Swiss-Prot record:
Function as written in the Swiss-Prot or TrEMBL entry: Allows the formation of correctly charged Gln-tRNA(Gln) through the transamidation of misacylated Glu-tRNA(Gln) in organisms which lack glutaminyl-tRNA synthetase. The reaction takes place in the presence of glutamine and ATP through an activated gamma-phospho-Glu-tRNA(Gln).
Protein name: Glutamyl-tRNA(Gln) amidotransferase subunit A
Residues at the catalytic site: 74, 149, 173
Gene name of the encoded protein: gatA
Enzyme class, UniProt record, top EC level: ligase
Length: 486
């Protein structure tokens, strides 16, 4: 049920907020042991919040836009008084003394916290297998990964363990799991949504966004969480449009660009390619014009990203040294050993790998050859997008080259794991808004994701095109049956 339909039923008194919360809790008790999408459950407080909303409605009070909607929150967003672990032993016992801006805005709008979701440790991964607390399973096939790093949020939405969720996206961590789990995942323009209270991975790339079962809900949630925040110096001080007012507008005459380099990729699965091109044809039937465009440096994004992101991570994660908070190694004789053993034992292998890569790239003898060169290539990638948007309104690609892969398939091959973000990374490097939504299923009944990319701050058009495609294609109405899917 969409947020709009839920709100209508709540306002008419056809259903209570407590009833919805109890439905979600019952669903969690039914399938969570199989999926492991949550790290922390907030059931009793959620019920108490729902009762307050029902009392306000009964008293005739005007309800906020997300009143009673149950949310799951990725466990790298700070929630005051509630554990926020980043799926790491390093922060296993960390309880933030403050609330992140995005969650604060959700609760003010009437949203209810159901729980905190699993992720790759410190959001570094593409499968949710690097979590210190165990992997999350894909609800379409529990032998496969849900994607990452926001795999817990994607799996929870797909399986009906919440109505919507928040995740973070540094190189595809919302869109890739959305693709693997058959849900909608939106990465806004860099700076459109505050990062205050998001535990940093790579500060020039991180962005918070929603997961939902439909584009309309994503638009409603973005409307609530977007907007200027003086506590985040990178947060843009620009008006936030009413996205929901525009998603039903016709896309006739819009120019959709198919990025040539994405469809020529050697590793692109043929079923994925076929589904995405069929989606492009559907958009054409709605009146859009299809234009092939070239972004020559698009596929250089992954090499660029894996210099810049680890470099920023090595700086951001330097604060975890056992001195002020977080895990601290015991039975050490001096400060130097305490720091070394704290980091060696507190961080998992993937986080350590990226810290080492970043430290190397920033070292005195290599900073010009690697980090500064990567920043130059990042500028060229951004210029490719700028040139493309002179001729088109929206860009279209697959979200990921493949559907969800088997658990453990890439654990000993980091490069193969990294390549699953090949098509999502460039939008992060350029700071562009992007969305993934289902566009079909492969022969194994696994969902395939369509990625749409818009120009800076053009989420309105992005959501409009995504919504029009979703309404016309009705992909999820013909989805294969699964007991773990909502």
């Amino acid at each position: 049920m969409s947020i709009a339909k839920w709100r209508q039923k709540l306002n008419k008194g056809e259903v209570s907020s407590l009833e919805l919360i109890n439905q979600q809790i019952n669903r969690i008790e039914e399938v969570e042991n199989t999926l492991h999408s949550y790290l922390y459950l907030n059931h009793e407080k959620a019920r108490a919040s729902a009762i307050k909303i029902d009392e306000a409605r009964a008293a005739g009070e005007e309800l906020p836009p997300l009143a009673g909607v149950p949310f799951a929150i990725k466990d790298n967003l700070c929630t005051k008084g509630i554990p926020t672990t980043c799926s790491s032993k390093m922060l296993e016992e960390f309880i933030p003394p403050y609330e992140s801006t995005v969650t604060q805005r959700l609760w003010k709008a009437g949203g209810i916290l159901l729980g905190k979701t699993n992720l790759d440790e410190f959001a570094m991964g593409s499968s949710t297998e690097t979590s210190a607390f165990g992997p999350t399973k894909n609800p379409w096939d529990i032998t496969r990964v849900p994607g990452g790093s926001s795999g817990g949020s994607a799996a929870a939405v797909a399986s009906g363990l919440c109505t919507a969720a928040l995740g973070s996206d540094t190189g595809g961590s919302i869109r890739q799991p959305a693709s693997f789990c058959g849900v909608v995942g939106l990465k806004p323009t860099y700076g459109r949504v505050s990062r205050w209270g998001l535990i940093a991975f790579a500060s020039s790339l991180d962005q918070v966004g929603p997961f939902s079962t439909n584009v309309s809900d994503a638009a409603e949630i973005l409307q609530v969480i977007a907007g200027h925040d003086p506590r985040d110096s990178t947060c843009l001080d620009v008006p936030v449009p009413k996205y929901s007012d525009h998603i039903s507008e016709s896309i006739s005459g819009l120019r959709i660009g198919l990025i040539k380099e994405c469809f020529d990729q050697e590793g692109l699965d043929l079923e994925v390619k076929k589904s995405v091109l069929k989606a492009a044809d559907q958009l054409q039937s709605l009146g859009a014009e299809l234009i092939e465009v070239s972004c020559p440096r698009f596929t250089d994004g992954i090499a660029t990203y894996y210099v810049i992101a680890p470099s920023e991570a090595s700086a951001n994660l330097a604060r975890y040294d056992g001195v002020k908070y977080g895990y601290r190694a015991k039975e050490v004789d001096n400060l130097s050993d305490m720091t070394a053993f704290t980091r060696a034992r507190g961080f998992g292998s993937e986080v350590q790998r990226r810290i080492l890569i970043g430290t190397y790239a920033l070292s005195a003898g290599y900073v010009d050859a690697y980090y500064r060169k990567a920043q130059q290539v990042r500028t060229l990638i951004r210029r490719d997008f700028e040139n493309a948007f002179k001729n088109v309104d929206i860009l279209l690609t697959p979200t990921s080259p493949t559907t969800a892969f088997k658990s453990g398939a890439h654990q000993n091959d980091p490069l193969a794991m990294y390549l699953s973000d090949l098509l999502t990374i460039p939008a992060n490097l350029a700071g562009l808004p992007s969305i993934s939504l289902p566009c079909g299923f492969d022969e194994k009944a696994l969902p395939i994701g369509l990625q749409l990319i818009a120009n800076v701050l053009d989420e309105t058009r992005l959501l409009q095109v995504a919504h029009q495609y979703e309404q016309a294609a009705e992909i999820m109405n013909s989805a294969p049956e699964s007991s773990l899917i909502n």
